[in-house]
C-alpha cells in the first residue's frame, strides 16, 4: 500500500574478515540484494535504512556524503551487479567503461604511450583485466558496445570493472547468473 512502510530486511548483521568469502543464501525475495545494495547506499530513493549502522574497516560509513561514498565505491568496495545490461552504458565501448573506473579511482593517465607495447597504461590494464575474466580476443573486443557481447561476456566485463581497482571488499549479487556455458567445465 502507498504510504505504508514495508520492511524489506530486518536485524541483519554480518562481519567479513579480510580474505574471507561469505555467501548470503536465501529464497527469492528474502532481501539478499537489498542487503548488498544498502552497503553502498545504492537503494532506490523510496528506500531507507531506518536503524543500525554499516561499518567498514572500523568506521561507520552509513552517514558518508556523496563524495566520500564515490571514493569508497570502486576504491575500497566494489559490486558486481546481477544484470550487466542495466549497469553498462549502451553507448560506450567496454574499453571506455573499464578505463573510466581506472581514471576516476587510480588517476592513471590514458595519454602516455609505453614505447615497448605502443599502448597506454590504461589500455594495458584494461586488456589484462579482460584476459583475466576470460574474454576471448580481448583486443578485438575493446571497441565493442555492450549489446554486441553475449550475456556471459557482459557479465565478465562487469566483473573486470569491479576488480579494476583491487577493492578490499567485493560484493557480488548473483554474479554468475548471466555467465555462459564456457565457464561450466
Task: Describe the function of each predicted region.
Residues 1-11, 42-48, 65-68, 91, ...:
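A short, flexible loop at the N-terminus of ABC-type nucleotide-binding domains that lies
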Residues 49-60:
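Conserved ABC transporter NBD signature motif
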Residues 60, 114-140:
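Conserved ABC ATPase "signature" region
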Residues 61-78, 96, 104, 119:
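ABC ATPase NBD coupling module
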Residues 98, 159, 170, 183:
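Hydrophobic anchor residue at the start of the ABC signature
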Residues 144-149, 153:
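Conserved ABC ATPase signature
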Residues 164-168:
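A short, proline-enriched helix->beta-strand linker immediately N-terminal to the Walker B motif
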Amino acid at each position: 500500500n502507498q504510504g505504508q512502510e514495508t520492511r524489506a530486511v530486518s536485524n541483519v548483521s554480518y562481519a567479513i574478515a579480510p580474505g574471507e568469502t561469505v555467501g548470503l543464501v536465501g529464497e527469492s525475495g528474502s532481501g539478499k540484494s537489498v542487503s548488498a545494495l544498502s552497503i553502498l547506499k545504492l537503494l532506490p530513493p523510496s528506500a531507507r535504512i531506518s536503524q543500525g549502522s554499516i561499518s567498514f574497516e572500523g568506521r561507520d560509513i552509513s552517514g558518508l556524503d556523496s563524495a566520500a561514498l564515490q571514493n569508497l565505491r570502486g576504491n575500497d568496495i566494489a559490486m558486481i551487479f546481477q544484470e550487466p545490461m542495466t549497469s553498462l552504458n549502451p553507448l560506450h565501448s567496454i574499453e571506455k567503461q573499464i578505463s573510466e573506473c581506472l581514471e576516476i579511482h587510480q588517476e592513471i593517465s590514458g595519454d602516455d604511450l609505453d614505447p615497448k607495447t605502443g599502448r597506454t597504461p590504461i589500455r594495458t590494464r584494461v586488456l589484462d583485466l579482460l584476459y583475466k575474466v576470460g574474454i576471448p580476443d580481448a583486443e578485438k573486443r575493446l571497441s565493442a558496445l555492450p549489446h554486441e557481447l553475449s550475456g556471459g561476456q557482459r557479465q565478465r566485463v562487469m566483473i573486470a570493472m569491479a576488480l579494476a581497482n583491487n577493492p578490499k571488499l567485493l560484493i557480488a549479487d548473483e554474479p554468475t547468473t548471466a555467465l555462459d556455458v564456457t565457464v561450466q567445465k
